[in-house]
Each structure stands twice: as structure tokens, then as C-alpha cells.
């Protein structure tokens, strides 16, 4: 789960995040041009989080495979290796704790999903603010 958070943070640094078609998992993308491994992983995770969000909003079961790539953040090379360190790792741990809670939650999935996205935003605010507005779009808005 730490990997997932790390990936989310670095993905956010790249403003050219692609959106997958609903239901398509993008787990094994090859970096294009000069994209770092972390950037590619962040794109995959963003796409997966869109699918997770749609499933939660529709009241469907979230496919756990959508979380399979989060641990890759431990070995994916970031665009800027200077971000790696105790502060970044702390944000990653927080994010992965949120992912664990989301996976265990049975009733308040929307709330726990938003907690997880907020953990992404917290890291991006400190390390990579570029994609913050895009990541905010993942938040599930309250029903009126």
C-alpha cells in the first residue's frame, strides 16, 4: 500500500494522466518517451481509481485486482529521486493505511474512498502539486 501512495504522489506530478475506458485495467504499461516508471504507475493507479470510484458510486463490489499495482511504488523509479525520504515515506504509509481501511470497509465505502484520495492530495500538496486538480476529481461528492 505504501507503493500505491508513492505512485499516486508521483503520478500527480505528471499533468498528462490518461483515462482508461471503464473496465480496462492498465497494469503493464511501458513508459513512453521520458516518463519514469513512477509516472507510468501513477497513470495506471489514477485509471484504476476512476474505476473504483464508479463501482462504489454504483453500489457494486470493487474488484481487488485494481489495487494490485500499489506495491510497485517501492521499486518504481520516480522522476525526481530527491523526493524520496522519511517525509515522503510517511505520506506513503498514511496512504496505504487508508487503502487498507477502504478494502476492509463494508458500509461507508464512499467516505473511506475519499479518505484515500485525500491522502493522495496531502502528498501532492507537499511533493508534486501539478496534478492536484485532476486528483480532486476523484473525490465522491455527497448526495443531495
Q: Where are the model-predicted features located?
A:
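Sec-dependent signal peptide recognition
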Residues: 1-4
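Extracytoplasmic c-type cytochrome modules immediately beyond a signal peptide or single-pass transmembrane anchor
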Residues: 16-117, 132-144
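C-terminal motif of bacterial Sec signal peptides marking the signal peptidase cleavage site
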Residues: 9-12
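The canonical Cys-X-X-Cys-His
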Residues: 116-128
Amino acid at each position: 500500500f505504501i507503493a500505491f501512495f508513492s505512485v499516486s504522489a508521483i503520478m500527480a506530478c505528471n499533468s498528462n494522466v490518461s483515462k482508461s475506458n471503464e473496465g480496462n485495467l492498465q497494469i503493464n504499461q511501458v513508459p513512453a518517451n521520458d516518463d519514469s516508471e513512477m509516472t507510468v504507475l501513477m497513470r495506471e493507479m489514477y485509471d484504476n481509481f476512476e474505476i473504483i470510484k464508479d463501482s462504489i458510486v454504483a453500489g457494486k463490489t470493487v474488484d481487488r485486482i485494481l489495487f494490485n499495482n500499489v506495491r510497485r511504488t517501492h521499486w518504481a523509479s520516480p522522476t525526481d529521486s530527491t523526493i524520496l525520504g522519511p517525509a515522503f515515506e510517511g505520506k506513503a504509509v498514511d496512504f496505504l493505511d487508508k487503502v487498507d481501511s477502504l478494502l476492509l470497509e463494508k458500509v461507508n465505502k464512499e467516505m473511506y474512498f475519499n479518505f484515500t484520495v485525500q491522502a493522495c492530495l496531502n502528498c501532492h500538496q507537499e511533493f508534486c502539486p501539478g496534478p492536484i486538480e485532476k486528483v480532486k476529481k476523484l473525490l465522491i461528492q455527497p448526495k443531495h
